[in-house]
Amino acid sequence: METVQPGSEKEREAIDRFKSFYQVFSAEIIKDRIRTVYAGPAYFRDGYREVTGLDNIEAYFLKSAETVHECTFDIQDVAVHEGNYYFRWVMNLTTKRWKDEPITAVGMSHVRFDQEGKVIFHQDYWDTSLVYEKIPIVGSVIRWVREQF
């Protein structure tokens, strides 16, 4: 698969577009911009789900946004190596159910862009147990396990 040309204007625009898309995670932004960021056959995976295809990614993001009160990503830096882009970020999240209990998580997105500068591969790495801890019984178990080590 051909990827965006390193050092090109398209590469810079792809990076900027990705960073801008994730500044605020909301249904409005997803609906308005996802098709400018992700390619049709894109692959996405995070700690909750693995999704292939732009329509499926959009549906997953919109479903996720339904539970969010506010979610922002502060992208700290970007590393590039042989067509792979690594975005290191801090997510600040409050859910509709737990508005008074903000979650801050450090994570990283491994991304590849196609030749048009759209995301074709996106794998997120972060500690999803920070969200699971909020669920009454599951949270108790996770906290207990953490205390054991």
Explain the meaning of each model-derived region.
Residues 24, 43-44, 96:
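General structural signal for alpha-helix termini and helix-helix connectors
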Residues 1-32, 36, 148-149:
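Short, low-complexity N-terminal intrinsically disordered segments enriched in polar/charged residues
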Residues 15-18, 54, 104:
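A structural signal for well-ordered alpha-helical scaffolds and beta->alpha junctions
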Residues 1-6, 66-72, 79-149:
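A beta-strand edge to alpha-helix "cap/lid" segment located at domain peripheries
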Residues 12, 31-83:
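A solvent-exposed, acidic/Ser-Thr-rich amphipathic alpha-helical stretch
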